[in-house]
Amino acid sequence: MFATRSFCLSSSLFRPAAQLLRPAGRSTLRNVWRRSIATEHLTQTEANSRLASQRVHRPNSPHLTIYEPQLTWYLSSLHRITGCVVAGTLYAFAMGYLVAPLAGYSLDTATISGLIQQVPTWIKVPAKFVISYPLTFHIFNGIRHLIWDTTKELSLKGVYRTGYAVLALSVLTSGYFAMI
């Protein structure tokens, strides 16, 4: 009630509208800085050189080298890389399987097992590890992501714990597959 009463008794309400607008209009128009717009016609090379000189003075964004590498970076990039490697290998083998008969080659299981039997064991074991590691890592890290989708293990400690578990399980299962 008091706020309404003091508002009604304000002296500015009793002035005519022309008096209220006149002083404000005069002072703001006097203080406005007017600048004419200058344009110039540039050739393409002049425009490119001006743009290049402006780019020199722009601030650079931070590079990845200023950040401390973390396990989560490595596992995320390795998950993407192994996904591409596994999918690329699958597609390459499928295309080879389809195109081989057209080129006069046989790419059936008997031929592949015959070729693998000719390879010495000291080459087969590391080769099987190298072949199986991307697949096992991608599978276990995919399971890790599915666990995260259930909102479990999302703490910093849980993320690192599951990351080390994925690495250990991938190495162990790849080693097992290499020894078979």
Swiss-Prot record:
GO terms for cellular component: mitochondrial inner membrane; mitochondrion; respiratory chain complex II (succinate dehydrogenase). GO terms for biological process: mitochondrial electron transport, succinate to ubiquinone; reductive tricarboxylic acid cycle; tricarboxylic acid cycle. InterPro entries: SQR/QFR_C/D, Succ_DH_cytb556, SuccDH_FuR_B_TM-su. Pathway: Carbohydrate metabolism; tricarboxylic acid cycle. It is found in: Mitochondrion inner membrane. It comes from the Eukaryota. Keywords: Electron transport, Heme, Iron, Membrane, Metal-binding, Mitochondrion, Mitochondrion inner membrane, Transit peptide, Transmembrane, Transmembrane helix, Transport, Tricarboxylic acid cycle. The keyword DNA-binding does not apply. It is a multi-pass membrane protein. Residues 104-122 are mitochondrial intermembrane. The chain crosses the membrane at residues 83-103, 123-143, 160-180. GO terms for molecular function: electron transfer activity; metal ion binding; protein-membrane adaptor activity. The heme is bound between the two transmembrane subunits. Pfam families: Sdh_cyt. Heme binds at residue 138. Its main location: mitochondrion. Residues 1-82, 144-159 are mitochondrial matrix. Membrane-anchoring subunit of succinate dehydrogenase (SDH) that is involved in complex II of the mitochondrial electron transport chain and is responsible for transferring electrons from succinate to ubiquinone (coenzyme Q). Forms part of complex II containing four subunits: a 70 kDa flavoprotein (FP), a 27 kDa iron-sulfur protein (IP), a cytochrome B and a membrane-anchoring protein. PANTHER family: SUCCINATE DEHYDROGENASE CYTOCHROME B560 SUBUNIT (PTHR10978), SUCCINATE DEHYDROGENASE CYTOCHROME B560 SUBUNIT, MITOCHONDRIAL (PTHR10978:SF5). Belongs to the cytochrome b560 family. NCBIfam families: succ_dehyd_cytB. This is Succinate dehydrogenase cytochrome B subunit, mitochondrial. The lineage of its organism: Eukaryota, Fungi, Dikarya, Ascomycota, Taphrinomycotina. The gene is sdh3.
